[in-house]
Amino acid sequence: MEITLSKTLPSYPSFVEGIRRAPDRGYTLTPAQTATALKNALRYIPKELHETLAPEFMEELRTRGRIYGYRYRPQGDLKAKPIDEYKGNCIEGKAFQVMIDNNLCFDIALYPYELVTYGETGQVCQNWMQYRLIKQYLEVLTREQTLVIESGHPLGLFKSKPEAPRVIITNALMVGLYDNQKDWHTAMQMGVANYGQMTAGGGRYIGPQGIVHGTFNTLLNAGRLKLGIPQDGDLRGRLFVSSGLGGMSGAQPKAAEMAGAAAIIAEVDASRIETRHTQGWVGHVTDRKSARLSS
């Protein structure tokens, strides 16, 4: 069985105003590395479309520091649908489609158009060609097969058995000699390494609820260790000051509340503040213009 993208060129999608976009990651490749990066992206594309898409991919690489293949992103919001609305030969194949669409939903993903779910760089996969191919593989996956995905690249379906994993994923396994920031950045640009965080590339992101219990335990134990709080006590009467209201750090205000403390959490991105407030992780929002500190 051969899984390929269509020879029909998709229409270039429009971008919804107000949706967060990832910053330019920086283009630092040599000419030879650039050629390899283009080949790595074009390997997913039928040869008939290479001449059209090569300049487009080059422009993405030059201006965004990555080749995302925006043209292959489905139009609109990728909200997770009821599982029975997905094509598939097994429940696991359908379930994984639900999970990755949930990771890329406008209401959930940090930078939906760049496939970043959370953590500033945590991607589901590297580009939209990989997304489409992964979806196609999941639609035909059976309980006698396992899909292997390497840094977003769908390696293929392998003969397996029902009790084995339906999907095996690895992300960004760098050889020790090249496990440094410079070579990592090069590998990302060239399309051979994907930083999936924990649950972005793993397809199972659940937001701050995944870390709130650990944050609660950390705060409470810090109080016991540093403030002499008894084992059966909590942090009432204490003020917790921190920063960050992202996908993980957004658990801080709720964790502090659970531990009995008051909390002040600073965040420079207004959109992230709005998201956490709407979701209930933050109880009150103010800005520096309205905030007043008494002397």
Enumerate the language-model features and the residues they cover.
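Long, compositionally biased, glycine/small-hydrophobic-enriched stretches that function as flexible linkers
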Residues: M1-P208
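Hydrophobic, well-ordered beta-alpha structural blocks that scaffold small-molecule cofactor pockets
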Residues: Q189-G280
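General structural feature for long, well-ordered alpha-helical segments within catalytic domains
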Residues: L53, Q126, Q130-Y137, P165, ...
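Short coil/turn linker and secondary-structure boundary residues
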Residues: L29, V268, T286-R288
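Hydrophobic, Leu/Ile/Phe/Ala-enriched alpha-helical segments that form helix-helix packing faces
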Residues: I134-L141, L219-K226, S295
